[in-house]
Swiss-Prot record:
InterPro entries assigned to the protein according to its UniProt record, in alphabetical order: NqrB/RnfD, RnfD_bac
Topological category with respect to the lipid bilayer: Multi-pass membrane protein
Oligomeric form and interacting partners: The complex is composed of six subunits: RnfA, RnfB, RnfC, RnfD, RnfE and RnfG.
Cofactor(s) this protein cannot do without: FMN
Organism: Marinobacter nauticus (strain ATCC 700491 / DSM 11845 / VT8)
Residue stretches spanning the membrane: 20-40, 42-62, 89-109, 120-140, 204-224, 228-248, 255-275, 282-302, 306-326
Protein name: Ion-translocating oxidoreductase complex subunit D
């Protein structure tokens, strides 16, 4: 039997960015499907609108910079930014609020820094945070009540009219606070058992939201299995939330239980799809663990003591600030080299 001789290194060709981003889009579809099934058409409409506007904004700015538009649009990164914003925004967000968020993400947070690979901050979270700070009412009062498509959720036409016309419609009766918001504002005057007994929390812990988070968890596991992302950031993210929740868990009548933190809000979307952005995240495995854990801790702190019930965007952006510091002290090992041994050179113990 003839042996094939091949010189080292036996390196595999890197996956093109367009294929990686396509897998991210496909892995997020179960979460989008769950959002649509349990909260109506709002997120699906937001996703289509945000992706279209993200591609248009990127194309326009690339044209202004004299760059080949078709070449850069094919990397699918603008589509992923639009997708993440559409998944993160409230279901009935006015079109102009989501539009400002998308344009800010693409133009300000990405293209002004030089485009793909040059942005120090997660573009989607920059757009989300800007919209939340600038339009707090629109970003906090347009969440849909959990109602399945077959169980009375607003129709496609009603949802479309609410988003793009802003008029008073029957949809207004379907808006409500999220489970995290409900818990945060009622725990001061009620016991934990009383708060969790509200219909907002459903049979498990967060009516509708638990299935959305589990769907994003399934998509995230797929990305890890395909080696699109590594496990370090998501696991450290969730471990950070769990550690903080367990540390304060003895006071159950003041702080939300662990399962609410894990299965409500944008926890799984943030852990597997947002925090793992390869450009703005830490580089080495050790750095990714620190980065992910920092985000998880910040999410818990802001949810518990901050002004915003969900805190993924601000936590990711704050840790983006820390990435240069983390990378400086946790550089990846150079291929073929070992860590230097401590001690005086030429001296051996004995």
């Amino acid at each position: 039997m003839a042996l094939v001789q091949q010189s080292s290194p036996h390196a595999r060709r890197a996956r093109p960015t367009s294929r990686v981003m396509l897998w991210v889009i496909l892995a997020a579809l179960p979460g989008l499907l769950a959002q649509t099934l349990f909260f109506g058409w709002g997120n699906l409409i937001n996703v289509v609108w945000c992706i279209a506007l993200a591609l248009g904004s990127e194309a326009a700015f690339l044209k202004l910079r004299g760059k080949p538009v078709a070449f850069f649009l094919r990397d699918n990164t603008a589509a992923v930014t639009g997708l993440l914003l559409g998944l993160s925004l409230p279901q009935f967000t006015p079109w102009w609020v989501s539009g400002i968020a998308v344009v800010s993400a693409i133009v300000v947070a990405k293209q002004l820094y030089g485009g793909l690979g040059s942005n120090p901050f997660n573009p989607a979270m920059v757009g989300y945070a800007l919209a939340l700070i600038s339009f707090p009412v629109a970003m906090t009062t347009n969440w849909a009540e959990a109602a399945t498509l077959w169980g009375g959720a607003p129709g496609f036409g009603e949802t479309l009219a609410k988003i793009f016309t802003g008029g008073q419609t029957a949809v207004d009766g379907w808006t409500m606070a999220t489970p995290l918001d409900e818990y945060k504002h009622k725990i001061a005057s009620h016991t934990s058992v009383e708060v969790l007994g509200h219909p907002t929390f459903g049979d498990l812990i967060a009516r509708g939201w638990e299935w959305v988070n589990l769907a994003f968890l399934a998509g995230g596991v797929l990305l890890i299995a395909l080696r699109i992302i590594t496990w370090h950031i998501p696991v450290a993210f969730l471990a950070g939330i769990a550690a903080m929740s367990l540390a304060f868990g003895s006071n159950a009548d003041q702080y939300a239980p662990l399962q609410l933190h894990l299965l409500a809000g944008g926890t799984m979307l943030g852990a597997f799809f947002i925090a793992t952005d390869p450009v703005s995240a830490a580089t080495s495995h050790q750095g990714k663990l620190i980065y992910g854990a920092g985000i998880g801790v910040l999410v818990y702190l802001i949810r518990s003591w901050g002004n915003y019930p969900d805190a993924v965007a601000f936590s990711v952006l704050l840790m983006n600030f820390a990435v240069p510091f983390i990378d400086h002290y946790t550089p990846p090992r150079t291929y073929g080299h070992h860590k230097a041994r401590r001690g005086v050179p030429g001296r051996s113990g004995g």
